[in-house]
Amino acid sequence: MDLEGDRNGGAKKKNFFKLNNKSEKDKKEKKPTVSVFSMFRYSNWLDKLYMVVGTLAAIIHGAGLPLMMLVFGEMTDIFANAGNLEDLMSNITNRSDINDTGFFMNLEEDMTRYAYYYSGIGAGVLVAAYIQVSFWCLAAGRQIHKIRKQFFHAIMRQEIGWFDVHDVGELNTRLTDDVSKINEGIGDKIGMFFQSMATFFTGFIVGFTRGWKLTLVILAISPVLGLSAAVWAKILSSFTDKELLAYAKAGAVAEEVLAAIRTVIAFGGQKKELERYNKNLEEAKRIGIKKAITANISIGAAFLLIYASYALAFWYGTTLVLSGEYSIGQVLTVFFSVLIGAFSVGQASPSIEAFANARGAAYEIFKIIDNKPSIDSYSKSGHKPDNIKGNLEFRNVHFSYPSRKEVKILKGLNLKVQSGQTVALVGNSGCGKSTTVQLMQRLYDPTEGMVSVDGQDIRTINVRFLREIIGVVSQEPVLFATTIAENIRYGRENVTMDEIEKAVKEANAYDFIMKLPHKFDTLVGERGAQLSGGQKQRIAIARALVRNPKILLLDEATSALDTESEAVVQVALDKARKGRTTIVIAHRLSTVRNADVIAGFDDGVIVEKGNHDELMKEKGIYFKLVTMQTAGNEVELENAADESKSEIDALEMSSNDSRSSLIRKRSTRRSVRGSQAQDRKLSTKEALDESIPPVSFWRIMKLNLTEWPYFVVGVFCAIINGGLQPAFAIIFSKIIGVFTRIDDPETKRQNSNLFSLLFLALGIISFITFFLQGFTFGKAGEILTKRLRYMVFRSMLRQDVSWFDDPKNTTGALTTRLANDAAQVKGAIGSRLAVITQNIANLGTGIIISFIYGWQLTLLLLAIVPIIAIAGVVEMKMLSGQALKDKKELEGSGKIATEAIENFRTVVSLTQEQKFEHMYAQSLQVPYRNSLRKAHIFGITFSFTQAMMYFSYAGCFRFGAYLVAHKLMSFEDVLLVFSAVVFGAMAVGQVSSFAPDYAKAKISAAHIIMIIEKTPLIDSYSTEGLMPNTLEGNVTFGEVVFNYPTRPDIPVLQGLSLEVKKGQTLALVGSSGCGKSTVVQLLERFYDPLAGKVLLDGKEIKRLNVQWLRAHLGIVSQEPILFDCSIAENIAYGDNSRVVSQEEIVRAAKEANIHAFIESLPNKYSTKVGDKGTQLSGGQKQRIAIARALVRQPHILLLDEATSALDTESEKVVQEALDKAREGRTCIVIAHRLSTIQNADLIVVFQNGRVKEHGTHQQLLAQKGIYFSMVSVQAGTKRQ
């Protein structure tokens, strides 16, 4: 049951630190970056030319808009004069027709000229925008191609020690994500940046040259806008920090609970934990609502200020026009140029951000590229002897792994191997056997001493040459995802088919290969998954032999095989050894009997040498290992196939340093394990998203149904907000209309004052409606977020233990889901609804008004708008779809990179780094060519959308002039229609880009609904089932068959029958993994058996109420998990069905031998125990756990290795406490230390999920069976 501690401990710790560091990190996180110019260190002269020309084009493109405003201003003046003239005409009754038509012909001619100007600017923009985007994309694509190749080359060049300290998964991420970040940062985004800057400068230059007074007035308002934005940002960010902190607290609770889920389930703490979580969510909701209020006041205020600035600008502008200093066209030119210039600064920020990200990513990548390995497999230097005999010597070698420098593995190893000899290395796990093999290949260099071949220090020999004369077969051979023949070819580049066949015959693999349908061309699958262990191993041997190596290194080459395969492979190995210097490492000593020399390792040095018979006489390490293995074999003759497992268990028992050895083994196998985890991670992520039924928008909305009043108000405000844009268009055109009529200055003054005030009124309305819209949706969203998190967490706590065993449901994954899913759903519901309503209202009102004022022009515009909109959509799609397509295309090269990086040891042993590098470069060709092609396509679509606007202006105003000339519309109406439709369309475009990612939200909602609706097999919340009034405490297991749901192929219990009478103590013993802890978990009903029955007082426990059943069991496990609260609360956690009084807590503490210790603490029972009880020692934690189990006064006590983690002294104290606790209760004890269970009423010995022996301590000793040998092994190790 210490499973959970082990499984979730790591995840929890990581996330816990994340939470704490979050706020500190934000303050001081200044990631190292590379300098601006060194970002382009891989550009050649052509790339530089592309970038320079692209920048020039961007500057030209950026100047387009302000220049267009110049044209627009002059054009307005002409229209305004025409309006004045028309007004004048209509006042003169007696008018000559010639003047009239002549004048209007002039107007049309002028407009034709301006249409050409517009089109000219449009054409310039078309070309410039294309060059800007495609050239920057081309330059980026070419540089990224080089960076990818360089980076992969750099990785393939590093030595193994470097890989020990760098995470394999992280390197893959760098190859994909970080390189894409650089690509994002140095491509078209830089062009966009220069474009924005050009717009900014041109806008202000136009503004100051055409009318500096008005420019200064507009500029005077800008700081107010900027300042208010800064103040709001500050307030908001403090709220955000508070909100994050509250969520972090809630997250920490969730994490603590999920990491300790078995403890929570066993003690029925779900309700308590839910309340604790809910309390933190309440706090977060409160802050979130405050934040919504603040945020929306700030948005409203921003609109108020913007409209107010319009009012001021137009009021001052009309003053200037009336005094005759400016024309109305000048006012418009200045106003729009400055406005466009100011906005363009904001548009530059994504580019700046992308470039900053790229600099951060480049720092890590360039650091790896520039890292010079200490053992360079690409190096040409070093001696290449003509003739190698194969005499090996290790002279006084000391060594520790770079990832754990403090742990010394070899401590002065001396070993000589004559040419052609076979030397076997034996010893406990972790004594340094595999390390010698790795030093031989020069995967590492010794810290002291030297390794020599034929008397030459291997450090003077060329690295590649050295590795080419060595053949290696390891415990878990790595095959690559290609054909059998190709796999063998990895042994040596230019090997012929005959040589391959010869090697395969020597490796005893020829027959099984010829039986395969495609023979040598059979694909072996990823990591050789299509083949059995024995087949893989023989192909690996063939691969080693095809090199025709002088030296053969066999690192436990048969340990992973069953008896039959082992015999075949062993024969192959014996063949292969002939005439070669061979070093063999083996756990199964039967396989090394016939070695020339057997060397016994202990603690990093060789303590004995000789052949089998000599060493058996010496009665040293070798003798001990052999006797242990044979003892095991006698016991389980009928189970010979499981021999390796029990032998390893025996070894573990016998070796005191098995802990450190496990760590060492982990490090060797890490590259293999890591990669499998990686695969699993990928596939589970895919599985996660594939297995989820999609949900509709309404289904998501239903979750928020109770907040309908908020939605009504919000939608109403959104409609008003949508109508504000057309209202703006009307006022805007009316103000200009003032100057197209011949009124006396006083009337003009009054009218312009009126319209300026109306602008202000718009601002005030928008302040109110934007605030209300945001606040209502925000509040509803916060309520929803809280509700969803609560429901999801409640549902998680309801699931059974097998659900938590699923690798998809690790603590980390579940807490992330709790944090992200609800937030994403909230973003999509509220704001999405608001955005849709606002857009419909905006365009709808705009189009209706336009049709009223001028249907002909409206129709023309409505024909153009979709083209602009479609182009915009295409561009957005291209941008987002591009990223996906790029990812897909790079998957091929990613697979090669992943395979090479994850199996780097194998790649290095086979000296195939360059082959992989070549394959990687090949796989980049297609994506590279496509990226160049895409640069042009992207350039064309971008330039089209940019230029379309200019062309539509040309068409619109030329047609407008025609309508004005033929008196079908007034210029005022032309402007109104134009502003209403175009601004409407623009606003819709902008708002859509603000809409949060709806697709993500749908997936999140689907996750949420799936979890909420999932009913577990064993429902902890269930109220059904029997609840007997009394409980005796008789437990019976009848023919129980069971395996864990996550490992269905590994049987755990195979027909177990057991019986414990009330008040008896039953002890379970046996090797690791034989099913002892499983018995306890079945009794707690964490799982149900597949067959057979578990009975309590003769009633099947499936029929009892789950909560009731668990309430009568008290459990103490090997690593008890305490919660981050006081000692008293931790003890009281034992009974969550009621309020436990202080007296009971003290009584339980006394029974558990811990009361005196608690009283000695300054805060006594109120002392906080820290996260997972870290403030206490193991023995103290264990006794608090015992007190916790006793508080519920259980009828049955389950002790799962309750003292195994303690030192001798603590163990004695805890053992006394347990002996006290057992009195008068049925008790099931699991123990590795047999001394602790000698006085049990019944001892049961487990093997392979069945009972092998049972009786009292004395009876079992007399039988001289498994129990006897276990006791003697333990007594032996103690004596040592």
From Swiss-Prot:
Biased composition annotated in UniProt, kind: Basic residues: 662-672
Effect noted on mutating residue 893 to A: Risk factor for IBD13; has decreased enzyme activity
Tissue-wise expression: Expressed in small intestine. Expressed in liver, kidney and brain.
Description of activity control: Translocase activity is inhibited by verapamil and is sensitive to energy depletion. Inhibited by nicardipine. Inhibited by PSC833. Inhibited by vanadate. C1orf115 regulates drug efflux through modulation of ABCB1 localization and activity. Not inhibited by amantadine.
Residues with the Phosphoserine modification: 660
Residue intervals annotated with topology Extracellular: 68-116, 209-215, 317-330, 733-756, 854, 958-973
One Gene Ontology cellular component annotation held by this UniProt entry: membrane
Binding-site residues for ATP 2, renumbered to this chain: 1070-1077
EC numbers, comma separated: 7.6.2.2, 7.6.2.1
Regions that span the bilayer: 45-67, 117-137, 187-208, 216-236, 293-316, 331-352, 712-732, 757-777, 833-853, 855-874, 935-957, 974-995
GO MF entries: ABC-type xenobiotic transporter activity; ATP binding; ATP hydrolysis activity; ATPase-coupled transmembrane transporter activity; carboxylic acid transmembrane transporter activity; ceramide floppase activity; efflux transmembrane transporter activity; floppase activity
Cytoplasmic side: 1-44, 138-186, 237-292, 353-711, 778-832, 875-934, 996-1280
Phenotypic consequence of residue 185 to V: In a colchicine-selected multidrug-resistant cell line; confers increased resistance to colchicine
Gene Ontology biological-process entries: carboxylic acid transmembrane transport; cellular hyperosmotic salinity response; cellular response to alkaloid; cellular response to antibiotic; cellular response to borneol; cellular response to dexamethasone stimulus; cellular response to estradiol stimulus; cellular response to external biotic stimulus
Glycosylation sites: 91, 94, 99
Region annotated Disordered, chain positions: 646-685
Protein localization: Cell membrane; Apical cell membrane; Cytoplasm
Stated role: Translocates drugs and phospholipids across the membrane. Catalyzes the flop of phospholipids from the cytoplasmic to the exoplasmic leaflet of the apical membrane. Participates mainly to the flop of phosphatidylcholine, phosphatidylethanolamine, beta-D-glucosylceramides and sphingomyelins. Energy-dependent efflux pump responsible for decreased drug accumulation in multidrug-resistant cells.
UniProt-recorded name of the protein: ATP-dependent translocase ABCB1
Organism: Homo sapiens (Human)
Higher taxonomy: Eukaryota, Metazoa, Chordata, Craniata, Vertebrata
